A protein has these predicted regions:
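A noncatalytic interaction/capping subdomain that flanks phosphate/NTP-handling catalytic cores
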Residues: 1-164
Length: 165
């Protein structure tokens, strides 16, 4: 979402298209209404392995497959961490079954991936591609951490649970 505070920080163009707060809020309201009464899945996890820079993300979505995907991608909190989790730093709402109407919603297709950095809210609709959730989390981390003077890296590594190698 375009606001004066972030306008000059985003490379607006054919891919990153600005959306006004009023349009963002209208689509968000429609997505929330769409999700009412539906089975949803919620996952609370961490992005960023260094505790000094870790951000808490709450993922709310309608597809179990997408929830499983992000559950395997983000860092899962321990029982103790989950008990002390508190409020998420960012919330992602993914409603792939909700299709935007470009003529009414002011977007360019039935899908929309929108980030409101000031409200710490990400809305994804009209796309069943689970990677949009991942991309949104990483885009948020890239934006937020660079503001903190940190150059984020998009990488992962596996470790043997027995040998820790």
């Amino acid at each position: 979402m375009d606001t004066p505070a972030i306008h000059n920080d985003i490379a607006w163009g054919k891919v990153n298209r600005p959306i006004a707060k009023e349009r963002f809020d209208a689509i968000l309201a429609k997505v929330c209404a769409y999700l009412q009464g539906r089975e949803i899945f919620i996952f609370d996890g961490f992005a960023g392995a260094d505790p000094k820079y870790t951000k808490k993300f709450r993922i709310v979505n309608e597809l179990a497959s997408q929830n499983l995907f992000i559950r395997d991608l983000l860092i899962r909190p321990t029982t103790e961490e989950l008990a002390a989790y508190g409020e998420a730093d960012y919330t992602v709402i993914a409603a792939p079954g909700f299709k935007c109407d470009p003529a009414i919603d002011g977007v360019h297709s039935e899908a929309a991936i929108m980030i409101d950095y000031e409200a710490h809210l990400i809305v994804i609709c009209g796309s069943q591609y689970a990677g949009e959730i991942k991309k949104s989390v990483f885009s948020t981390m890239n934006y937020v951490l660079t503001k903190e003077g940190i150059l984020p890296m998009h990488c992962s590594a596996n470790m043997d649970p027995v040998t820790h190698e």
